[in-house]
Amino acid sequence: MDISINDCTDISQIKQRFHDLQVESQRTDEKLERLLSDAQPTEKFNSLIKNMAERLVLFVGQIEELKDAFCNTTIVSEEVIERIKSVDREQNRIKECLLFVRQVRDFKECLQDLNRAMHHQQWEKAADLVHRASSTSPAIIEGKFAHAVVPTAEQPLAPMDTLKEITESLHTLFWREFHKAARNQDQKEITRYFKLFPLIGKEKEGLEAYWHFFGGIIASKARATLDEPPTHALFFAQAFTGLVEHVASIIRAHTPLVQKYYKAKNTITVIEKLQGDCDRQGSIIVNTMFDVRRIDNLVSSIASYKYILLHAKLKNRAFVSDQKELERVSLQTLHPILNEMSAIVSKWNISKIFISRLVLRLSQSDGTSNDPSVQDNLICASIFNSSKMELLLKKQLLPSLLQLETYYFRRSIETSLELEEYYTKVSPWMSSIVDDVMYVTKQVFQRAFFTVSSLFFTRFVNESLIPILRNDYYVYLSHNLLTVCNIIKAQFQRLKNANSIPAKQVENYITLVNSASLSKQYLKSIVDGVSSRLEEVFAFAKDQKLVKKSIDNFLQLTVNFENLCKTSFNMYFPIFLLPRIEQCIDDSFDGINYVLSYEDYTKETEHERLVVTRLRSVWDRVLLLEQFTPENQLSLRSMACEKAASYIENLILYKIQWNDYGAMALENDISSLITIFSNDQANLRHSFERLQEILILLVWESDSTAPEQLINDLNLQLLSIDIVSAIMEKKANVQGED
């Protein structure tokens, strides 16, 4: 509490009051200092505002002066603008005049330099100068000023006439030198003068000279080849191959040069002309081949062939050797001709693909086709729409090839049937016709495929190959096999004993069913051999679809052979295998007790059970299938496993008596038997899935006996409610007896 100085009573109070006054004085001084320091920025800010106000007043005054000046000088501004425009026009005229004079001067200098270049025989420089001079506007060259200043004593004609005269002179010179280099086969000089034609505005003439030169080379080489006598079987195929490869090499080597100096559009024109030469020479080669090989006569000869032996074999009639039909054309004669014709078709179609890709690339580089999806869906170039060679192939070569190939294939099958033998000394047993027919099938299929002609391939496969295989080869095999099956079935029904059936009939059956199985495998391997190369061989998207469809149709033949095997197995299995399988299982379970005590169960499980030992020793002998093909063995083993599983199910449900411990022993025994039956092959174990569900149910302990509940609890997929009910009822009866 503060005390007034007048109220102090002693010295200590006076000292305290003095101290308080000093503290208060110090606080007051600090407060004054803060106020002074805050006042300085405020003064500075006020000074700045005052300065800005003075400048703003000055700025407003200047704006008023400018406003008055603009308002009073409107007419003067329009006059100034008009004068400026006038000066600009005069300046532009002067620039145009200077440019005009400069262009005329440059044109005159070009002509003078051109005259000197020609005098010194500097043809590249001369051509370049002509190109520069020709780039000048015709209005300038034909103007009065140019007519007045350009002519000289050395070049007195009008400027345009002088340029035309020099151009024609150079054109004549280049044409002469180009043909001279062509006669001398001087590739360097040919290229030199070929590049100069576009510079003097003679692109068309340059391309014409190029085409005539190389067209002459193509024709002369083709004629030289045909002038030689045909010394070997593939003479005309070799001649045609040489022709298309020669044309392709010319196009491949010179396309970059032509494209560089003549542009892509003109390059396509050159390719069309060279392809036209290839057409003409190729047609000559094909027509000559038809004459020399007498192909039309061959086609006429085979048309009257009746296939008497083949029909007799198909109808299983005896054939008298004296009635053997005279062979019109030998297969040895026909085979090289087919190779020759196919090679020509192949080379032509490969050439079409090459040209089409090149034309597409040139079109894209020229900007006429820039769709990126076009390259993935290549189509044939329009060049071939009017091709003579293409027409000759469609009208003459391919129809003849189709008839000859069809005869070759069917006659080969007829010969195979005539020479048929059964091979039963080595396993698997089979007929000789399988190797013979499938070898020829692969040969003609691949020959048709590699013609690279979707038209020929689809027609041959769909109209000849498939019908002949189905109506001749398949019918022959199926008729013989089903006949043997019916004979065996009839004998079994009469004798009631499979062992009494003649061994010859069984031998015929195994041989024929193996032949059907091998035929299916061969057909698949033939298709696999070409399917991976479909897109590589047939580049056109449309062709790929047609060929793929024909291959799929061909592959459907395998279904016929597969069904034939299944049908024959349905006869063979119940007669020869099923009784042995059932007897084997009965013998294995004979005398085996499954009503066991705990002690009996423990003792029995210490070693392999007798039922397992018995089956292990006889199962391989029961399925003695070594004469069958591996695929047929697998099919029969699969059928055996299915029947074994079904038979054991029946034993469990209706014959074998078991209790709880016996069910456990039974489950162990059958699990071991399944391993023996399936030979540890996973694809055979699936036949026992239903049996394994029954085993699970046998050893399952549950308070619930409702079948539906058990099916849900154990996730039983294959057992019906009736089967589950029967098993649970049998378990209940066993437990009741216990």
UniProtKB/Swiss-Prot annotation:
Listed InterPro entries: COG4, COG4_C, COG4_M, COG4_N
Highest taxon listed in the record's lineage: Eukaryota
Disulphide-bridged cysteine pairs: none
Pfam families: COG4_C, COG4_m, COG4_N
GO CC term (a single one): nucleus
PANTHER family tied to this protein: CONSERVED OLIGOMERIC GOLGI COMPLEX SUBUNIT 4
UniProt similarity note: Belongs to the COG4 family.
Subunit composition and interactions: Component of the conserved oligomeric Golgi complex.
Role: Component of the peripheral membrane COG complex that is involved in intra-Golgi protein trafficking. COG is located at the cis-Golgi, and regulates tethering of retrograde intra-Golgi vesicles and possibly a number of other membrane trafficking events.
Protein's name in the database: Conserved oligomeric Golgi complex subunit 4
UniProt source species: Schizosaccharomyces pombe (strain 972 / ATCC 24843)
Lineage of producing organism: Eukaryota, Fungi, Dikarya, Ascomycota, Taphrinomycotina
